[in-house]
UniProtKB/Swiss-Prot annotation:
It comes from Neisseria meningitidis serogroup A / serotype 4A (strain DSM 15465 / Z2491). The keyword Cytoplasm applies. The gene is nagZ. The active site is at residues 187, 258. It is an enzyme of class 3 (hydrolase). Plays a role in peptidoglycan recycling by cleaving the terminal beta-1,4-linked N-acetylglucosamine (GlcNAc) from peptide-linked peptidoglycan fragments, giving rise to free GlcNAc, anhydro-N-acetylmuramic acid and anhydro-N-acetylmuramic acid-linked peptides. The record marks 185 as: Important for catalytic activity. Its main location: cytoplasm. NCBIfam families: PRK05337.1. The lineage of its organism: Bacteria, Pseudomonadati, Pseudomonadota, Betaproteobacteria, Neisseriales. This is Beta-hexosaminidase. It comes from the Bacteria.
Length: 361
């Protein structure tokens, strides 16, 4: 069978279960679509996951990019057969107790294990690290954050990024310019952060600035309003994305929207309007999760935005290790020692409980 050549479009969609339905295959063949995000509902075991990713990648060329939220703690979509990853605040605790060097070493090991295990299963990208500061206000962020100190967050995220790269994956910092100060969960409401730009610059923006300088591949903006800067949520704001992130910070990588079905995005109108505003604000790729009907509505008479960099940016997010090479790494003694080390961080301080993030129920 001839595999159709279809350039990757600017929409990342999802699927319902363990295998593709015929309807989903047709949806993923649409030129509007360029990637697939997987969730816990798509995982039964490692063998099934490998079959699913191979099925997705066999649909078209260039292959669809496959992503997942696999941060550690309560945001780890695949459990059985994978190393249990600690929540990132465990690294902050190591930073405070044992010093920066010990915490950075642990972060590199976590990134390596995280990325290599996913790479072996045909996954291109995990949406990590979380660069939000832990102000103690936001339950949906909470222990997903490394620390409250911007320097600690930046250094631990950079160490994690080095581990991810060793395992074949790029990094995606989120949620620009910072979701940690607000109380609301943008999956459920549209939060507001009333601080000034200078206050944000002094704290929350620092990790994004440092990581941009150090090769962070992608950014995901927050569905949060910062009214002293713009009345629009950051993901819909040209001020935040084109002026502050691109021009002032100098970020040159990929901008993924957060899920456009989240409540924090719904005030912008229907799905076509949300996507249009996201693209105009500066997003390269939009996520539409848990609502295949909205993906279909969006792709109906869809006009692909003029973005000459899109193909290159998509390709930049593709896995660089490959499943066979990753599987070979997993068999080595060094990697198995890293797995044991990482599992040891998670076991006594397991933080999988708490607010659930981004799953459909």
């Amino acid at each position: 069978m001839t595999v159709p050549c279809i350039p990757r479009g600017p929409v990342m969609a999802d699927i319902a279960a363990f295998r593709l339905t015929e309807e989903e295959k047709q949806r993923l063949l649409d030129p509007a679509v360029g990637g697939v995000i997987l969730f816990r509902r798509n995982f039964q075991n490692i063998a099934q996951l490998k079959e699913l990713t191979a099925e997705i990648k066999a649909l078209r060329t260039p292959e669809l990019i496959i992503a997942v939220d696999h941060e550690g703690g309560r945001v780890q979509r695949f459990i059985e057969g994978f190393t249990r990853l600690p929540a990132m605040n465990v690294l902050g605790q190591i930073w405070d107790k044992d010093g920066a060097s010990a915490a950075e070493t642990a972060a590199r090991q976590i990134g390596w294990v995280l990325a290599t295990e996913l790479s072996a299963c045909g996954i291109d990208l995990s949406f990590t690290p979380v660069l939000d500061l832990d102000w103690g206000n936001c339950a949906v962020i909470g222990n997903r954050s490394f620390h409250r100190n911007p320097e600690a967050v930046a250094r631990l995220a950079l160490a994690l990024q080095k581990g991810l790269e060793k395992g074949g994956m790029k990094s995606c910092g989120k949620h620009f310019p910072g979701h940690g100060f607000v109380e609301g969960d943008s999956h459920l409401v549209l939060p507001e952060d009333g601080r000034s730009l200078s206050e944000l610059e002094a704290a929350d923006l620092a990790p994004f600035r440092i990581m941009s300088r150090e090769g962070m591949a992608a950014v995901m903006p927050a569905h949060v309003v910062y009214p002293q800067v713009d009345t629009k949520p950051a993901g819909f704001s040209e001020i935040w994305l084109k002026q502050i992130l691109r021009r002032d910070i100098g970020f040159k990588g990929v901008i993924f929207s957060d899920d456009l079905t989240m409540e924090g995005a719904c005030g912008a109108g229907g799905i076509k309007e949300r996507a249009r505003i996201s693209f105009e604000a500066g997003c390269d790729i939009v996520l539409v999760c848990n609502r295949p009907d909205l993906v279909d509505e969006l792709r109906d008479d869809f006009r692909i935005p003029d973005n000459p960099a899109l193909a290159q940016r998509w390709q930049y997010m593709a896995n660089t290790l490959g499943s066979a090479a990753a599987q070979a790494v997993i068999q080595t003694a060094d990697f198995q020692a890293a797995q044991a080390f990482v599992a040891g961080l998670a076991s006594p301080q397991d933080t999988a409980g708490g607010v659930k993030v981004g799953e459909a129920f």
